[in-house]
Amino acid sequence: MNPTLALTEDLIRRRSVTPADEGCQAVLETRLKALGFTCENIVSGPDDFRVTNLWAVKRGTQGTAGKLLAFAGHTDVVPTGPLDQWSSDPFEPSHRDGKLYGRGAADMKTSIAGFVVAVEEFVAKHPEHKGSIAFLITSDEEGPAHDGTVKVVEALKARGERLDYCVVGEPTSVDTLGDMVKNGRRGSLSGKLTVKGVQGHIAYPHLARNPIHLAAPALTTLVNEVWDAGNEYFPPTTWQMSNIHGGTGATNVIPGHVTIDFNFRFSTASTPDGLKSRVHAILDQHGLDYTLDWTLGGEPFLTPRGDLSEALGAAIAAETGVKTELSTTGGTSDGRFIAKICPQVIEFGPPNASIHKIDEHVEVRFVEPLKNVYRGVLERLIA
C-alpha cells in the first residue's frame, strides 16, 4: 500500500468526531518531527469541549526571511448518522469499487495525509529548500470553531508570525480532481428576530395583535430585497430564512410572539454593518416591535490571482491535465480566519459529493495525484 493511502486509513480509524482528535495529531506530529519540524500543541476550550490544535514549522535555508507555505486542515469529522445505513463501519476503512469508504475520507483526512507525504517526498528531494513549511491542524472545524484555527491564528498574530501562502485541504473538486479550487468564501451573518404581539383568543382578533401577521409584510420585503449585485468573484448576497416558530401549539390561541432565524451569505460587495442597518431599517419601516440578535459567522475573504493560484493551477494541470476553475461558492471554512494573517489562501482537495453523507468516500485513483499536486505546489513556491 502506498504511504498516502496507508496514512489516510490510519487517520480514518480514529473516531475523531468534533472536538475529539483521538490521536490523529500525535500521528502527524511524530512524522513531522522526523523531518525536522518544531511542533507546538495549542489546547483550548472548556473542560467539556477541549480542542486540540497543532502548529508545526520547518524553516528553510532562508529562515524567517524566506517565504512560508502553510497547510491548514482539520482532524475532526462530523457524526456518522445512523450506523445501520452505512455499508461498512465508518471508522474501519473499506475498499469497494475503487473507492475508500470511511468518515473523513473526503473531508478531509485524505488531504491531510496527502500533504504530509508530499512534504516527506519534497524534503527528501530538496533537503536545502529555501522557503519554510508549516502545518495548522485543528480538531474544531466541523463544530462551533471557537477554539480551533481562530485561536492558533490569534497566537500567531500576537507574536508576529508571517504566512505568505496557505493551502487549505477542503474537498473542493466537483466531478474530477482539480476541476475546482476555492480562492475565497462568502461571509456568513445570522440573525434571530423576535416580533412581539399580544396573545389572545383566535375568535377575538380585535383583542389581540398577531405577530405572525405583523411580521409577514416585512418578511416579504426582506425576501424581495436586492442586497447587492455581487462582483467579479462573488455571486450576489443572499438572505434566507431557516426557521419560523410562533404559537403555543393550540389551534385557538393567537401567539404573543414569533421568532424567525435567518442568514446572509454575503460577498465583498457588502459589509456586516451595512446589512444589519438595512434589515433594521426595513423592520422599522413596518413599525414592528421586535428584538434582533446577530451572529457573525465569518467575513468574506478573497485571494486574487497570484503566485499561489498560479502554482496550484500549474501543478493540477501537470498532474491531471485539468484546467482548474477558481470559485468562491459553498459554505464557510477556516480560510476566513487564516486570511487575516495570510494574503494568499486557497482551498484544494478531492471531490466533495459524499462529504457529511452516509458512506462517505474518496476515489482511490485520486489519492496519489492529490499528493503529487501538493508536492508540485511546494516545488514551485519554496524549493
From Swiss-Prot:
Its EC number is 3.5.1.18. The keyword Metal-binding applies. InterPro entries: ArgE/DapE_CS, Bact_exopeptidase_dim_dom, DapE_proteobac, Peptidase_M20, Peptidase_M20_dimer, Peptidase_M20A. Zn(2+) 1 binds at residues 74, 107, 170. Binds 2 Zn(2+) or Co(2+) ions per subunit. PROSITE patterns: ARGE_DAPE_CPG2_1. It is an enzyme of class 3 (hydrolase). Keywords: Amino-acid biosynthesis, Cobalt, Diaminopimelate biosynthesis, Hydrolase, Lysine biosynthesis, Metal-binding, Zinc. One of its GO terms (molecular function) is acetylornithine deacetylase activity. Pathway: Amino-acid biosynthesis; L-lysine biosynthesis via DAP pathway; LL-2,6-diaminopimelate from (S)-tetrahydrodipicolinate (succinylase route): step 3/3. The keyword Disulfide bond does not apply. Its cofactor is Zn(2+); Co(2+). Catalyzes the hydrolysis of N-succinyl-L,L-diaminopimelic acid (SDAP), forming succinate and LL-2,6-diaminopimelate (DAP), an intermediate involved in the bacterial biosynthesis of lysine and meso-diaminopimelic acid, an essential component of bacterial cell walls. This is Succinyl-diaminopimelate desuccinylase. It comes from Cupriavidus metallidurans (strain ATCC 43123 / DSM 2839 / NBRC 102507 / CH34). The gene is dapE.
